Swiss-Prot record:
This is GTPase Era. Residues 156-158 are annotated as: G5. Keywords: Cell inner membrane, Cell membrane, Cytoplasm, GTP-binding, Membrane, Nucleotide-binding, Ribosome biogenesis, RNA-binding, rRNA-binding. It comes from Xanthomonas axonopodis pv. citri (strain 306). The keyword Transmembrane does not apply. It comes from the Bacteria. Belongs to the TRAFAC class TrmE-Era-EngA-EngB-Septin-like GTPase superfamily. Era GTPase family. One of its GO terms (molecular function) is GTP binding. Pfam families: KH_2 (PF07650), MMR_HSR1 (PF01926).
Length: 299
């Protein structure tokens, strides 16, 4: 008797939610590699990117997005919201990521955007490992599901990679029978040059004060292979001279630490030795300037 095998499935899934619920951590966990930067700060993700998760049964092309939020005053906020909404075009399904024990107005906004898109939505309740009272999860799920339709509901811990197998199984059911869109060794549609800039920005988000990271962006001026060595030149842009001094730090100590930690992350991701140079420059008001945002690669 011949063995019956399940058909191969392949499709795209948007990962949507308010800021700081763990969308990028979930994307990285499903891909099995770091394709999206993460920090404890809201709005760490500014760009839409694809994370490619390949399994024996199929392939999920995950569209990681900036967090949907109500703030629209600054150009940067508008750009990020456009990127998040635009990620729903042509996808087969979507994941709504929320935080266990919390549902607020921005979660409602995200659900409304998904409802308007008309795609199947899987609710992922992340950070369940942080719940002190695990029995509180079930009434919370009942409350969130009341009056809302989900294709499936999955409590998970993306950070600890708990509950992901069942999630993958349900997502594969929602995408069509098709051949893989990407090769098995591909993990993202973004270039190493782009990822290098993101890894520097990740360190800015982690090492600087409360507001300053949001006034910074990173531009890769040089990315070249020199034998087995990658030579990378990164410009950190800020909006004021005072911010420049803070990023550099006394005697250049903070900039050195930012560059050193970013370099180690690059070497781990790229599998090569990296020579990284960093500079800090000022462009006043760049984060509220549509032309500047476009020049820096924001969609």
């Amino acid at each position: 008797m011949s063995e019956i095998t399940s058909p191969h499935r392949s499709g795209s899934v948007a990962v949507i939610g308010r800021p700081n619920v763990g969308k990028s951590t979930l994307t990285n966990a499903l891909v099995g590699a770091k394709v999206s930067i993460v920090s404890n700060r809201p709005q760490t993700t500014r760009h839409r990117l694809l994370g490619i998760a390949t399994f024996p049964e199929g392939q999920l092309v995950l569209v990681d997005t900036p967090g949907l939020h109500r703030e629209q005053k600054r150009a940067m906020n508008r750009v990020m919201n456009r990127a998040a909404r635009g990620s729903l075009e042509g996808v087969d399904a979507a994941v709504l990521v929320i935080e266990a024990g919390r549902w607020d107005e921005e979660d409602t906004l995200a659900f409304r955007v998904l409802s308007d898109a008309g795609v199947p939505v899987v609710l992922v309740v992340n950070k369940v490992d942080r719940l002190k009272d695990k029995t509180a999860l079930f009434p919370f799920l009942a409350q969130v599901s009341e009056g809302r339709t989900f294709a499936a509901v999955h409590p998970v811990s993306a950070l600890k990679r708990k509950g992901l197998d069942a999630l993958v199984g349900d997502l594969l059911k929602l995408v069509p029978e098709a051949e893989a869109m990407f090769g098995e060794d591909e993990i993202t549609d973004r270039s190493q040059r782009f990822l290098a800039g993101e890894l520097v920005r990740e360190q800015l988000m982690r090492q600087l004060g409360e507001e300053l990271p949001y006034a910074t962006t990173v531009e890769i001026e040089r990315f070249a292979e020199d034998g087995a060595l990658l030579r990378i030149g990164a410009v950190i842009w800020v909006e004021r001279e005072g911010q420049k001094a803070i990023v550099i730090g006394k005697g250049g100590t903070r900039l050195k630490e930012i560059g050193g930690k970013a370099r180690l992350q690059m070497e781990r991701l790229f599998g090569a030795k990296v020579f990284l140079e960093t500079w800090v420059r000022v462009r006043e008001g760049w984060s509220d300037d549509e032309a500047a945002l476009k020049a820096f690669g924001y969609e």
